[in-house]
């Protein structure tokens, strides 16, 4: 799993061109998400929790975005088949599925989120805690739905192009006790303001996007993303591209 963020001690990131497909807004246009696979919770940092995108999102125009870092375009037929299959797998499932009795207790792992846009236009989402660990105790349809979306993610990683966008979500995490020499706060990037507990986040666009990408390039090691604000506060700065409908 990759994220275009600075804390790449947890993940690796990708950057690049090909922004034409990612710049379309999803308000009233064709790019409404119609299927998704993601994760919530688990033992992750506060920054990762805020920046973690869906593992794979399929939009109605066939655009697949994986980890907010790779993209792939499906045909209309592939898009329709994927949505139909996801609807079959998820229809009738409860909003939060529970494993059958006898499942082992698993803690500190993410909850799998699977979703599909139904014929009524509403997004149906099903959450399955610890699906990866106790899949045999869940209805097989949930594993099949995840397998289907995982296949799209694998295709995008192998044959897709880099996903970039004109908007970015940035996160500054307080790092008063961090080791290493901090760099001056990058010019053009908003400094944290107000409450920072333990993070501060902001969605940015325009020149600020170019500034943060220059200051914290995709793939940069965690230890090199330490910055000092004009007031002397230390923060680890991270970011990822926003999805079209975020």
Question: How would you label these PLM feature ranges?
Answer:
Residues 4, 48, 104-106:
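Generic marker of residues within folded, mature protein domains
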Residues 10-13:
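C-terminal motif of bacterial Sec signal peptides marking the signal peptidase cleavage site
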Residues 15-43, 95-246:
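Short, well-ordered, aromatic-rich surface patches in folded extracellular/luminal domains
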Residues 20-78:
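Extracytoplasmic low-complexity, Pro/Thr/Ser/Ala/Gly-rich segments
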Residues 63, 87, 119:
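Residue-level marker of positions within ordered structural domains that often coincide
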Residues 78-103:
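Charged, amphipathic alpha-helical segments
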């Amino acid at each position: 799993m990759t994220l275009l963020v600075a804390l790449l001690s947890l993940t690796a990131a990708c950057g690049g061109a090909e922004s034409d497909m990612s710049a379309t807004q999803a308000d009233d246009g064709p790019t409404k998400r119609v299927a998704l696979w993601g994760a919530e919770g688990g033992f992750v940092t506060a920054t990762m929790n805020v920046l973690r995108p869906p593992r794979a999102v399929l939009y109605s125009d066939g655009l697949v975005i994986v980890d907010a870092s790779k993209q792939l375009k499906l045909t209309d037929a592939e898009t329709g088949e994927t949505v139909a299959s996801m609807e079959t797998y998820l229809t009738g499932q409860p909003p939060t599925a529970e494993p059958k009795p006898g499942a082992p207790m698993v803690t500190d792992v993410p909850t799998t989120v699977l979703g599909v846009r139904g014929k009524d236009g509403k997004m149906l989402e099903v959450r399955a805690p610890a699906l990866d660990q106790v899949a045999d105790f869940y209805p097989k349809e949930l594993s099949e739905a995840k397998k289907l979306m995982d296949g799209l993610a694998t295709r995008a990683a192998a044959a897709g192009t880099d996903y970039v966008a004109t908007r970015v979500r940035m996160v500054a995490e307080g790092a008063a006790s961090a080791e290493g020499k901090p760099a001056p706060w990058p010019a053009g990037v908003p400094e944290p303001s107000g409450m920072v507990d333990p993070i501060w986040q902001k969605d940015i666009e325009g020149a600020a996007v170019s500034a943060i990408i220059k200051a914290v390039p995709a793939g940069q090691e965690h230890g090199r993303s330490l910055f000092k604000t004009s007031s002397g506060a230390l923060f680890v700065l991270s970011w990822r591209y926003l999805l079209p409908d975020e």
